[in-house]
Amino acid sequence: KKCMKTLLWLDDYRNPMEDDWLNFSPIGKDVEVVWVKSFNEFVDYLNKPIPLPDAICFDHDLGEEKTGMDAAKYLVNLCNNLRLKLPKFNSQSSNPVGRENIMSYLENYKKISSTKSYY
Protein backbone atom coordinates (compact mmCIF):
# COMPACT_ATOMS: atom_id res chain seq x y z
CA LYS A 1 0.00 0.00 0.00
CA LYS A 2 1.56 3.23 -1.09
CA CYS A 3 1.81 6.08 1.36
CA MET A 4 -0.75 8.82 0.93
CA LYS A 5 0.71 12.17 0.07
CA THR A 6 0.15 14.96 2.56
CA LEU A 7 -1.55 18.23 1.71
CA LEU A 8 -1.20 21.06 4.22
CA TRP A 9 -4.27 23.28 3.88
CA LEU A 10 -3.87 26.78 5.34
CA ASP A 11 -7.26 28.46 5.60
CA ASP A 12 -9.13 30.02 8.51
CA TYR A 13 -12.53 29.35 6.95
CA ARG A 14 -12.78 26.93 4.03
CA ASN A 15 -13.07 23.27 4.96
CA PRO A 16 -10.88 21.45 2.41
CA MET A 17 -13.16 18.41 2.51
CA GLU A 18 -16.23 20.39 1.48
CA ASP A 19 -17.38 21.43 -1.98
CA ASP A 20 -14.62 21.13 -4.57
CA TRP A 21 -11.85 22.82 -2.61
CA LEU A 22 -9.49 19.91 -3.21
CA ASN A 23 -9.48 20.94 -6.89
CA PHE A 24 -6.82 23.39 -5.72
CA SER A 25 -4.54 20.58 -4.56
CA PRO A 26 -1.44 20.46 -6.81
CA ILE A 27 -1.03 16.74 -6.03
CA GLY A 28 -4.57 15.52 -6.70
CA LYS A 29 -7.43 14.66 -4.37
CA ASP A 30 -6.19 11.32 -3.05
CA VAL A 31 -4.35 12.97 -0.18
CA GLU A 32 -4.15 13.08 3.57
CA VAL A 33 -5.24 16.60 4.45
CA VAL A 34 -3.88 18.52 7.43
CA TRP A 35 -5.99 21.62 7.98
CA VAL A 36 -4.30 24.52 9.80
CA LYS A 37 -6.25 27.71 10.36
CA SER A 38 -3.64 30.29 11.35
CA PHE A 39 -0.05 31.35 10.78
CA ASN A 40 0.92 29.95 14.18
CA GLU A 41 -0.65 26.55 13.48
CA PHE A 42 1.15 26.54 10.12
CA VAL A 43 4.51 27.23 11.79
CA ASP A 44 3.88 24.65 14.52
CA TYR A 45 3.15 21.99 11.92
CA LEU A 46 6.25 22.77 9.86
CA ASN A 47 8.42 22.64 12.99
CA LYS A 48 7.38 19.09 13.85
CA PRO A 49 10.12 16.47 13.39
CA ILE A 50 8.36 15.03 10.33
CA PRO A 51 9.02 15.53 6.62
CA LEU A 52 7.55 18.60 4.95
CA PRO A 53 4.12 18.05 3.39
CA ASP A 54 4.07 17.08 -0.29
CA ALA A 55 2.01 20.15 -1.08
CA ILE A 56 0.59 23.25 0.57
CA CYS A 57 -2.51 25.26 -0.33
CA PHE A 58 -2.43 28.85 0.91
CA ASP A 59 -5.26 31.17 1.79
CA HIS A 60 -4.17 34.82 2.01
CA ASP A 61 -6.52 36.48 4.49
CA LEU A 62 -6.48 34.46 7.69
CA GLY A 63 -8.62 36.78 9.80
CA GLU A 64 -5.58 37.88 11.79
CA GLU A 65 -2.55 40.10 11.40
CA LYS A 66 -0.41 37.40 9.81
CA THR A 67 -1.40 36.39 6.29
CA GLY A 68 -0.76 33.52 3.93
CA MET A 69 2.06 35.63 2.52
CA ASP A 70 3.78 35.53 5.91
CA ALA A 71 3.34 31.76 5.84
CA ALA A 72 4.85 31.56 2.34
CA LYS A 73 7.87 33.60 3.49
CA TYR A 74 8.28 31.38 6.53
CA LEU A 75 8.22 28.29 4.32
CA VAL A 76 10.83 29.73 1.95
CA ASN A 77 13.16 30.63 4.84
CA LEU A 78 12.77 27.16 6.28
CA CYS A 79 13.48 25.43 2.96
CA ASN A 80 16.41 27.72 2.28
CA ASN A 81 18.00 27.30 5.72
CA LEU A 82 17.51 23.54 5.92
CA ARG A 83 18.22 22.96 2.21
CA LEU A 84 14.84 21.33 1.70
CA LYS A 85 12.96 21.11 -1.55
CA LEU A 86 9.97 23.44 -1.70
CA PRO A 87 6.70 21.48 -1.54
CA LYS A 88 4.28 21.84 -4.46
CA PHE A 89 1.90 24.73 -3.85
CA ASN A 90 -1.25 26.54 -4.86
CA SER A 91 -3.53 29.21 -3.42
CA GLN A 92 -7.29 29.03 -2.98
CA SER A 93 -7.50 32.63 -1.76
CA SER A 94 -10.41 34.74 -2.99
CA ASN A 95 -8.17 37.81 -2.64
CA PRO A 96 -6.73 38.11 -6.18
CA VAL A 97 -3.83 40.36 -5.18
CA GLY A 98 -2.93 38.25 -2.17
CA ARG A 99 -3.14 35.07 -4.23
CA GLU A 100 -0.91 36.52 -6.96
CA ASN A 101 1.65 37.72 -4.39
CA ILE A 102 1.90 34.29 -2.76
CA MET A 103 2.12 32.42 -6.05
CA SER A 104 4.72 34.69 -7.65
CA TYR A 105 6.82 34.76 -4.46
CA LEU A 106 6.93 30.96 -4.32
CA GLU A 107 7.47 30.61 -8.09
CA ASN A 108 10.41 33.02 -7.91
CA TYR A 109 12.00 31.13 -5.04
CA LYS A 110 11.50 27.86 -6.90
CA LYS A 111 13.29 29.31 -9.94
CA ILE A 112 16.20 30.63 -7.88
CA SER A 113 16.55 27.52 -5.73
CA SER A 114 16.48 25.18 -8.73
CA THR A 115 19.88 26.55 -9.72
CA LYS A 116 21.32 25.34 -6.40
CA SER A 117 22.92 21.94 -6.44
CA TYR A 118 20.95 20.47 -3.53
CA TYR A 119 17.54 21.04 -5.08
Question: What positions do the PLM features span?
Answer:
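Catalytic phosphate/metal-binding cores of nucleic-acid and nucleotide-processing enzymes, i.e., regions
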Residues: 3-119
